[in-house]
């Protein structure tokens, strides 16, 4: 994680360093990234970099945690919008994330490039979705699904996030239109609902 010195930087300087890092991590895998290119783009002295981060892996993890924070905020907002009902979450999350990504397309493309360049990396290092799911489970209103035991609830949430992610990726990979992908997501959610509520 960044040092206190990094957090004491003026926000524009911090953001410039992070944008330089994001751009570089989107260009090459973490192992191939050049700290020199990052510090040149950020216009900071090389010695300063090591006052902010232990190494480029430390910086890489911090960049990914920022994406985690965006994802978690979107999930929590969607959960609140759907009355904390888990079976309403996929469509609410789909709509919110789709709108956000359309408004922030350039940043989303950089994020997707970071994931593609680091495909061989442990998935747990890329995004903290399992931890986010556990936080969501604590906030969900399980009314009507009280009969599900803890493992079943976890499996249900995993399924719901999987189908939502698949629906979003179908749109961004241009396999389906946003309308068709949403329709299929609603259908899948309906099938899961019938199984979960029985």
Residue ranges of each PLM-predicted region?
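Helix-turn-helix
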Residues: 16, 28-58, 62
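C-terminal peripheral helix-coil segments that are non-catalytic and often amphipathic
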Residues: 139-142, 170-198
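Amphipathic alpha-helical segments that line or abut small-molecule/effector binding pockets
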Residues: 84-103, 158, 182, 186, ...
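Alpha-helical structural segments
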Residues: 12, 20-23, 27, 41, ...
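Amphipathic alpha-helical packing segments from all-alpha helical-bundle domains
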Residues: 69, 118-158
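Amphipathic alpha-helical segments used for helix-helix packing
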Residues: 89-124, 134-138, 162, 166-174
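Alpha-helical DNA-contacting segments of helix-turn-helix folds
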Residues: 53, 60-74, 104, 108-111, ...
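Basic, helix-initiating cap at the start of DNA-binding domains
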Residues: 1-28, 37
